[in-house]
């Protein structure tokens, strides 16, 4: 990978993020920086790029940390063997970009996902560090949506919920057979295990807030997921049944659908 400046990285990694549909910020509590405290806001302002299910226009900086990946999911343009131009941000580059875009009134928050680099744990550490730095180092009060990695250490995934408004773990495909065939590096059992753990942590966080007002919020906008439609032999009934099961088992805020893009 040649040396790229920030503008070039942004062009590549913002374009690569367009294949992720799960980008709505409904459900979070309102926070702002009026009164001179912190920076950022979850309330609508600036350039709107998406609509939340409650009808509000929202603007998010939607990027990947990197489009490099050690996995070879056949449906993904960023898969290991895909011939695309690669780029990578450091955690601090994403932090500074988010702050710069917010202060220019371009965005209300950040949607951050990533390809897998080095290992699932390493990548998850970088994603969490972005959110941690925004919240703790810069008192950022805007919206943060983090894509989490089911193969990562559960403690790292848990840390994501301490800093993000919403977290999401992609189920990828409607059927287990499709996942085994098209994404052999991924496991439906591990994905659902991570979603179950997140559901429990969200519920524990809500219970703690009921008992203790000082208890920290944990993913107040809940968790969501995304599945690709058209990549396997799943019927409409299979897709609807799968989504219904996910809503019931994991109390998801939303299941997003992305049509297969032939690459």
What are these regions (language model features)?
Residues 153-162, 233-246:
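Catalytic cores of alpha/beta
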Residues 68-78:
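Local cysteine-cluster metal-coordination motifs and their immediate loop/turn environment
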Residues 79-94, 102-127, 133-154, 161-212, ...:
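Core AdoMet radical
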Residues 226, 244-247, 252:
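Eukaryotic partner-binding/assembly regions in large regulatory complexes
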Residues 261-263:
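Conserved small/polar residues in nucleotide/adenosyl-binding loops
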Residues 1-68:
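Flexible, acidic/Gly-rich N-terminal and inter-domain linker regions that tether
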Residues 43-46, 94-97, 151-155, 240-241:
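Short alpha-helical segments and helix-capping/turn motifs at coil-helix boundaries
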């Amino acid at each position: 990978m040649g040396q790229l400046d920030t503008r070039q990285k942004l062009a590549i990694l913002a374009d690569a993020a367009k294949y992720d549909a799960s980008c709505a910020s409904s459900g979070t509590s309102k926070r702002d920086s009026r009164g001179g405290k912190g920076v950022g806001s979850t309330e609508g302002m600036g350039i709107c790029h998406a609509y939340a299910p409650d009808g509000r226009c929202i603007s998010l900086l939607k990027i990947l940390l990197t489009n490099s990946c050690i996995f070879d999911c056949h449906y993904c343009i960023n898969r290991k063997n895909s011939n695309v131009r690669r780029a990578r941000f450091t955690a601090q580059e994403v932090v500074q970009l988010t702050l710069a875009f917010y202060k220019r009134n371009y965005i209300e928050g950040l949607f951050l996902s990533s390809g897998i680099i080095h290992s699932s744990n390493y990548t998850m550490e970088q994603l969490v560090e972005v959110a941690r730095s925004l919240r703790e180092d810069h008192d950022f009060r805007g919206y943060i949506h983090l894509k989490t990695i089911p193969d990562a250490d559960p403690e790292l995934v848990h840390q994501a919920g301490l800093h993000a408004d919403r977290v999401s773990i992609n189920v990828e495909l409607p059927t287990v057979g499709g996942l085994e065939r098209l994404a052999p590096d991924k496991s439906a059992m591990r994905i659902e295990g991570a979603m179950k753990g997140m559901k429990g942590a969200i519920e524990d966080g809500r219970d703690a807030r009921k008992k203790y007002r000082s208890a920290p919020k944990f993913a107040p906008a809940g968790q969501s997921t995304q599945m690709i439609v058209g990549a396997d032999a799943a019927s409409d009934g299979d897709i609807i049944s799968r989504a219904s099961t996910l809503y019931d088992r994991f109390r998801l805020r939303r299941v997003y659908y992305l049509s297969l893009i032939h690459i």
